[in-house]
Amino acid sequence: MKNKMKVVLADTDESFRMMLQRMIEAAGDFRVVGSVGSGADAWYVIERECPQLVIMDVILPELDGFGLLDRMAAMAARPRAILVSAFCQGQVVSRAMTQGAESFLPKPCEVNELLGQMRHVAQRAEAEDARNAALERLVTPVIHEVGMPAHIKGYQYVREAIILTIKDATMINAVTKVLYPTVA
């Protein structure tokens, strides 16, 4: 990892959060930018700090883990999420993964296992960033080749639409219903 990944911790158990923060920062790969005890506070910190990773419990006051996952899914730079919870029935785990969680660990968990999951998420994020940059480098010359200069107002939208369509070819069949709203 080039830069330390920014992490937010959200759990009602303050002693667990403090222990986790110490262990995460001691590992050296990550920087904890927020440690909070409620979903509403977590959302505030996520909006302010733009972390790459959120480690949270499902059960949080004011806004639960599922609500946070929903809100994070709507963000342009969506942070990745690892859920750590004692409430780990099959339906809960399935719903968390469906809503975009990267991983779900039962509480109590081994800190080394969590750190391993965090590193795995960081590696996947780095690989995805590299793929996106490579795709952008491929698309940009094609746009120039068809004669669209970069200073035109809709240039960024066109480039984004092409990249989204390359990533998900089904979007080409629903340009006005899916592609346009996604780009906008």
Model features per residue range: what roles?
Residues 38-41, 64-67:
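Acidic catalytic/metal-coordinating carboxylates
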Residues 61, 89:
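The feature encodes the CheY-like receiver
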